Amino acid sequence: MMLTVTMNPSIDIAYQLDDLKVDTVNRVIETHKTPGGKGLNVTRVLSQLGDDVLASGLLGGKLGEFLEAELDKSAIKHSFYKISAETRNCIAILHGGYQTEILEQGPYVSAKESKGFLEFFEKLLPKLEVVAISGSLPKGVPVDYYSQMIAICKQHQVPIVLDCSGQALLEVLNGAAKPTVIKPNTEELSQIMEREITNDVAVLKHALASPIFSGIDWIIVSLGSQGAFAKHGQTFYKVTIPKIAVVNPVGSGDSTVAGITSALAAGASDEKLLKKANTLGMLNAQEKLTGHVNLENYDNLYQQIEVAEV
């Protein structure tokens, strides 16, 4: 079984408007409310693949109850740690080809709750094949929290796929316990390296060979429409993807994480892991809904992806 962790989940609310008018009333005909957060996007895709997955993280209040009820409707297994504060809302306004987002920061998590979740989390680890940790940390949680979670996974010899950014990622990179996989994009890589990282193969190879990534088995860098660049052990790969009609790119990174997680659990080869991850990322981009893939198109895209050692 695979475990996904979303420390700062949300109720994602989507409003579709022909035009967003400022300083007046905008009436919405259709509203979509779905369980949100990067880890839950990963969960949905793994579930669609037919993988055995359990969703976890922090939930609180009536919105937390709503989120669990929505997961139940989708037959997604979950085991969340309950906190006293309310789970957040995140609003996306789709208007005239644009997307304006209003994101609540999320609940405050007490020191007692932070400690409690680590104990709760450790009890979930036996018999797990892979843990995927995604997204931001809520207020109140120590900035090295992901490092603590990774250390616990290491004690139980469970591989970890980590998809986060900013200070939380830097803490992990500078810490003793390393994840199995990280998935930065070039912007995030530039922040880590404190210099501009382009899509150039030589530049990427030099960056990923930096000592800051020592101990991390896989580094998979998203290059958007240009595919991906990866380092596994001491081997580098360039992944070339076909051109597709993009409908909604939001969540494509999470779908890629789902592919990585699924392939790791299956013991897939390097080529199969990279092709599966990128196929699912593209499939997500072809759909209106975030964290959804049309598997009827899977084989067609999979066969068009090229993985070359460089």
Curated annotation (Swiss-Prot):
The lineage's top-level taxon is Bacteria
Q: Which reaction does it catalyse?
A: D-tagatofuranose 6-phosphate + ATP = D-tagatofuranose 1,6-bisphosphate + ADP + H(+)
Q: Does the keyword ATP-binding apply?
A: yes
What EC number(s) does its UniProt record assign? 2.7.1.144
Is Membrane tagged as a keyword? no
Query: Which terms are listed as keywords in the entry?
Result: ATP-binding, Kinase, Lactose metabolism, Nucleotide-binding, Transferase
Give the matching NCBIfam families.
Answer: 1-PFK, lacC, PRK13508.1
The entry's protein name is: Tagatose-6-phosphate kinase
Record organism: Streptococcus mutans serotype c (strain ATCC 700610 / UA159)
